[in-house]
């Protein structure tokens, strides 16, 4: 699709979203066609909700998020086939794999293990592996990435190349509020089991999160070497574990010591060469 066509599509969707109270299941024509076209672009990886520039800054294509939201107004509930034991679901969003056969899977080039769930408009790149996991609509999963068992990739989340999302990891989805950016895991990151990254936070390239690290917008991310406290973004090639910090007030009103509060701790930073040659367990050893 040309830049002119994309601009026209964006204009139609922006106007429809501004007038969304009048968009419903009876809406036909240009608006429905535009939303369908946008969802297809997302599904095929030809457009992304967020894109990284050469300067490392991520730009959010809000109009694509709006297309996803409009699709809920346009589409009725329907039976979704493919459940275990020939069971079905009841939803507005079909499976990405609806009507797929051998040819489609071979062309797509990724592995989809039984009981993984991928909703339409999510993109899965070649050589990715989906264990029994959940990938929500509008998400992007990069080439060679592993989405391990019971991991969740939320709506519009952006997962880079050669990322490992370990068992039970949660990558939060962000559709609303509209101004919020998606949660982003950049290339070559390792996210340890049962960790959670949510609320549009960014884990920069090559970083390692140990097991059970939770990062949201209000989570303190503390660099142990410098004492710097940051929020919302883990720097490139950081090794991060769960930790705690003393409260601002050393004692409570009753005289007892104040409880320590959770934080994420950057225990070390490594360069790209070290990261590529060093095992994950070795990096996480203190």
Curated annotation (Swiss-Prot):
Keyword Acyltransferase: yes
Location(s) in or outside the cell: Cytoplasm
A single GO BP: lysine biosynthetic process via diaminopimelate
GO-annotated molecular function: 2,3,4,5-tetrahydropyridine-2,6-dicarboxylate N-succinyltransferase activity
Gene Ontology CC annotations of this record: cytoplasm
Keyword annotations: Acyltransferase, Amino-acid biosynthesis, Cytoplasm, Diaminopimelate biosynthesis, Lysine biosynthesis, Repeat, Transferase
Catalytic activity: (S)-2,3,4,5-tetrahydrodipicolinate + succinyl-CoA + H2O = (S)-2-succinylamino-6-oxoheptanedioate + CoA
EC number: 2.3.1.117
InterPro entries per UniProt: DapD_Trfase_Hexpep_rpt_fam (IPR005664), Hexapep (IPR001451), Hexapep_transf_CS (IPR018357), THP_succinylTrfase_dom1 (IPR023180), THP_succinylTrfase_N_sf (IPR037133), Trans_hexapeptide_repeat (IPR050179), Trimer_LpxA-like_sf (IPR011004)
Pathway per the UniProt entry: Amino-acid biosynthesis; L-lysine biosynthesis via DAP pathway; LL-2,6-diaminopimelate from (S)-tetrahydrodipicolinate (succinylase route): step 1/3
Signal peptide: none
Database matches in PROSITE patterns: HEXAPEP_TRANSFERASES
Family: Belongs to the transferase hexapeptide repeat family.
Entry protein name: 2,3,4,5-tetrahydropyridine-2,6-dicarboxylate N-succinyltransferase
Originating organism: Rhizobium etli (strain CIAT 652)
Organismal lineage: Bacteria, Pseudomonadati, Pseudomonadota, Alphaproteobacteria, Hyphomicrobiales
């Amino acid at each position: 699709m040309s830049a002119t066509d994309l601009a026209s599509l964006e204009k139609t969707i922006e106007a429809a979203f501004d007038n969304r109270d009048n968009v419903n299941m009876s809406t036909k024509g240009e608006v429905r066609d535009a939303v369908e076209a946008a969802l297809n672009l997302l599904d095929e990886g030809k457009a992304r909700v967020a894109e990284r520039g050469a300067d490392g800054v991520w730009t959010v294509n809000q109009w694509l998020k709006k297309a996803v939201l409009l699709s809920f107004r346009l589409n009725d509930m329907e039976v979704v086939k493919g459940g275990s034991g020939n069971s079905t679901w009841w939803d507005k969003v079909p499976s990405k794999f609806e009507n797929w056969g051998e040819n489609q899977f071979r062309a797509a080039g990724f592995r989809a293990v039984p009981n993984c769930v991928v909703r339409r408009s999510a993109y899965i790149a070649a050589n990715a592996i989906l264990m029994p996991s959940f990938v929500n609509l509008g998400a992007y999963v990069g080439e060679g990435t592993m989405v391990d068992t019971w991991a969740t990739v939320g709506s519009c989340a952006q997962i880079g190349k050669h990322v490992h999302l370990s068992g039970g990891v949660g990558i939060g989805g962000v559709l609303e509020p509209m101004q919020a950016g998606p949660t982003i895991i950049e290339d070559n990151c390792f996210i340890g089991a049962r960790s959670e990254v949510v609320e549009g936070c960014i884990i920069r390239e090559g970083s390692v999160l140990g097991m059970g690290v939770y990062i949201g917008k209000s989570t303190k991310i503390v660099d142990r070497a410098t004492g710097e406290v940051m929020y919302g973004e883990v720097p490139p090639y950081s090794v991060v574990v769960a930790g705690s910090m003393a409260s601002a007030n050393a004692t409570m009103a009753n005289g007892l010591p104040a409880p320590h509060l959770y934080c994420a701790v950057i225990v070390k930073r490594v360069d790209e060469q070290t990261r590529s040659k060093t095992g994950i367990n070795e990096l996480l050893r203190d």
